[in-house]
């Protein structure tokens, strides 16, 4: 299953899942997506 955590590095409104995911990768997550304009990172747990 996946665990989620709000991104610490993402700045501004989250409008693009791709941008969010690439920021999440720099935070050692495996991906990410926008959720209510916030960038939420995901990784297996």
Swiss-Prot record:
Belongs to the DEFL family. Plant defense peptide. Disulfide bonds join 3-45, 14-34, 20-39, 24-41. It comes from the Eukaryota. This is Defensin Tk-AMP-D4. Pfam families: Gamma-thionin (PF00304). InterPro entries: Defensin_plant, Scorpion_toxin-like, Scorpion_toxin-like_sf.
